[in-house]
C-alpha cells in the first residue's frame, strides 16, 4: 500500500500543552482555574485559597504515581476533567533535584550529601534535568488520553548578551538552578509547549514620562526581546486575562465554559455559575491599554481623526483600527506623541 493513500487534510484537533508563566501574584493559577474542567497537581500549596479540585503532591514519586493513576482513569473514560494543571513547573524541577539527592544517598560513594551541587561536575543538575524531561513524556501520556496539559511557572529576569548588540534583560521561565545548569530543562519545556503565555502587570506612564505599575494585567502570546512567548493558534499578541477567551482560542469553540467538569461531574464552585467572561469590548480595551503609552492622549488623537467620538473609550475603537494598533503599537504611540506636540501625524 502506498503511503500516499494515508494523506489527510485539514486541522487536526488535539489536546494542547500550555505553559503559563509570570511574576508572583499576577494571577497565573487563577487563570488556569478558568481553563476547561481543571484538575490541579499542587506542588507548593499555592491553590489553598482557591475553590478548585486538586491533588497535593510533595515529592517526585508522588507525582509519578498521580500521573499514572490519572492516565489510567482518563484512558478508561472515568476522569471527569479536561485539563491537567501542574502548579508549578519550577517546584517540579525542585522535586527532581531532591530525588537525585535521595537516589545518591541510597548508595553513597563518598558519604551522604544534602545538596545537588555536591555531585561533582554538574552531574547532579544533569540528572535532575533528565528526570524533569522524563516527566514531560509522562504528561504526554496523559495528553494522549485526551487531557489538555497546563504547566504554571514563575519567571525570572535574565541578562541576554547577543553577539551582535548590547546586553539587555528579559523575562524568562524560572527553573531553580543556576542559569547555565537550568538551560536543558527550560529549553525542553519551551519546545514541549504548544503555547507559552506570559502574564504580567501592565506598565503605564505618567505625564512626566515616569513608568508606573498598576493593577491592569495582560497576557502576551508572541515572543519579544523582553519576554518569551509563543502560540500556534493565531492569538492576538496581547490579551486580557480572560480564561474563557483564551480557552476558546487554544482549545476550540467546543471547550465548554470555564470550570465545567466533563461527564456531568459536580462543579468545583458548588453549583454556582462561573463569573461572566469579559465582553469583547472589555477585552479589546485591556489589550489596547497594555500597548498604549498614554490612553488619554490616544483617545484625543483618535477623536481628532474621527475614529471615535467624544465620550467613547478604548472598548469602542473599531475592531479593524484596534487590530492596527496592536500590530504596530510603536508606530501608533509615535503618531500620538507627534499629535500632542502639534506636529504632523502619520
Give the positions of each predicted feature.
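Interfaces that engage single-stranded nucleic acids at replication/repair/recombination sites
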Residues: 5, 11-14, 26, 34-35, ...
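Short, well-ordered beta-strand core segments
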Residues: 38-40, 149, 196-198
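P-loop NTPase motor core
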Residues: 91-184
